[in-house]
Swiss-Prot record:
Keywords: Amino-acid transport, Antiport, Cell inner membrane, Cell membrane, Membrane, Transmembrane, Transmembrane helix, Transport. It comes from the Bacteria. It is a multi-pass membrane protein. GO terms for molecular function: antiporter activity; L-leucine transmembrane transporter activity. This is Putative leucine efflux protein. GO terms for cellular component: plasma membrane. It catalyses: L-leucine(in) + H(+)(out) = L-leucine(out) + H(+)(in). GO terms for biological process: L-leucine transport. Exporter of leucine. The keyword Cell membrane applies. It comes from Shigella boydii serotype 4 (strain Sb227). The keyword Transmembrane applies. It is found in: Cell inner membrane. Its main location: membrane.
Amino acid sequence: MVPGPNTLFVLKNSVSSGMKGGYLAACGVFIGDAVLMFLAWAGVATLIKTTPILFNIVRYLGAFYLLYLESKILYATLKGKNNEAKSDEPQYGAIFKRALILSLTNPKAILFYVSFFVQFIDVNAPHTGISFFILATTLELVSFCYLSFLIISGAFVTQYIRTKKKLAKVGNSLIGLMFVGFAARLATLQS
């Protein structure tokens, strides 16, 4: 697992909104990844990878969405309040939705799944769907374990940060800057 925007988003939400916020973000990532894996298996991801205009649309949507998320983080940091407050239940739905969109607009994930499944699934073998399902389930379980570790770690960090307001602002600012970096890298990504 290479930390990227999805990982950072889950970690940020586990720190700012507790374990519930972290797991809602993780669920958005899991569902988004499952959709991308299915698209890779169905051949749609290959079409996106080999069609420059489609790849560029996904790439720029992803970059703009990362910048949007960064602006929300920066705004909340400057205002001195948490973007996803624990007492505000409707924000939990926003966490899930943002994670899902973030996952679906990640062309690096599309490229990964296309190249990953090709290595392990023989398209000429019978029952490729079963092989795909087993491999996709394994990937999701590994992702669940990895993100659970981050969520639990984030919950512990939250206890420390609550007493250090300045540290929390610096942390949010750094996360925002990392999203800008991810957006710039995504905008310059080649298929």
